[in-house]
Design a protein with these regions (language model features):
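A detector of single, family-specific signature residues
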Residues: 1-345
Length: 345
């Protein structure tokens, strides 16, 4: 029996499937390992290459196996699927992972540290609470609309409705309706308080990260966007050959439908990290709204773009540019400089 050189590891909650091969590709190990005996099993092996799909708990196992001396590579599940043969089961999945991790063109995911994952938990919890607050706001608006009470859009309008609910002297709201609406209003206020706490924690994390502070200097990037970029990409910035590769990974480049030497570009791919894409486009929209009010003297490129393209198309193009600038600042260790400063230099 040959020495194990490469292992494909299909992870799950309780039982993990191992598929190991030697230098000739011959199968040496094909077995299931319980979670409790996982580290003991890999501790008994000589250091080897271990492939894992980038799914829940993958970063945890990646850190644990690297601590044992193994070389761990995480891969997007969609890229591994091409190597799956016949029926899908744990054994076949592990074999596909083992095959995929050895491919020279395979793209890998950087293993995140616990600190990065903690920051991402703040972002995901924030997303959840924002959605819940929006649901409560819509419910309050819908219920009061049935009573003929409406208000303006946005949080200011919701605040007006909350004031009506709190006013016991407003006879437009029946007592029974006021009782149930008061429950929703208290939940709305509680969510606002929790969101404030999460935002303070994000700001503290942002201030503790020198890279995150440098990213904040880019117009369109604030503490939320900066911390999301640093936490999501981590040490993987140099895995992108250029800023365009980063923008493509986020999904901010046109979709190609080219054949026969003829290039045809469509709308953006919307592949990759949806959350980062949403944040960058939102930041770009803020820059455009500011430019619409105060002019584009410092950014003539943006002025020309806004003149010939719809606002949302311009926002996506600007988001692409922001992503490229972020890559250059992190990879080259630079700081953001305004276009006017660059021209004078």
């Amino acid at each position: 029996m040959g020495e194990v050189i490469t292992i494909g590891l299909d992870i799950a909650k309780s039982v993990l499937q191992v598929h190991g091969v030697d230098e000739n590709g011959a199968v040496v190990i094909r077995k299931r390992v319980s979670r409790a005996k996982m580290l003991e099993f890999f501790g008994s092996l000589k250091p080897c290459l271990v492939g894992i799909e980038a799914c829940p708990a993958a970063h945890h196992w990646g850190r644990e196996l690297e601590a044992l001396g193994h070389s761990v590579r995480l891969m997007p599940p969609s890229y591994v699927k091409a190597y799956l043969k016949r029926s899908k089961n744990d054994a076949n999945d592990a074999a596909a992972i083992c095959e995929a991790v050895t491919r020279p063109t395979m793209r890998f995911v950087a293993i995140k540290s616990k600190d990065q994952q903690a920051a991402l938990m703040l972002h995901r919890a924030r997303q959840l609470l924002v959605r819940q607050r929006t649901m409560l706001s819509n419910a309050i608006r819908g219920h009061l609309a049935e009573l003929g009470i409406v208000s303006a859009k946005g949080r200011q309008g919701t605040g007006t409705l909350l004031g009506i609910i709190a006013d016991a002297g407003d006879r437009r709201v029946p007592p029974v309706a006021r009782g149930v609406l008061d429950v929703l209003a208290r939940q709305y206020h509680a969510l606002g308080s929790e969101l404030g706490s999460i935002d303070r924690n994000l700001l503290a994390w942002h201030r503790s990260s020198e890279a995150s502070r440098r990213l904040e200097e880019i117009p369109g990037i604030g503490p939320v966007v900066a911390t999301a970029l640093i936490a999501e990409i981590g040490d993987g910035w140099k895995a992108f050959r250029s800023g365009r590769n980063l923008a493509a990974w986020i999904g901010l480049v046109p979709r190609q439908q080219s054949t026969g030497g003829k290039e045809k570009l469509g709308s953006i791919t919307k592949q990759g990290n949806r959350y980062l894409r949403w944040l960058l486009v939102a930041g770009a929209m803020a820059v455009i709204r500011y430019a619409q009010k105060h002019g584009t003297l410092k950014r003539p490129w943006l002025g020309r773009l806004m003149a010939r393209r719809p606002t949302k198309v311009a926002a996506v193009a600007l988001a692409n540019k922001i992503a490229r600038m972020a890559w250059a600042i992190i990879v080259h260790g630079e700081r953001y400089r305004e276009p006017g400063v660059l021209a004078a230099a």
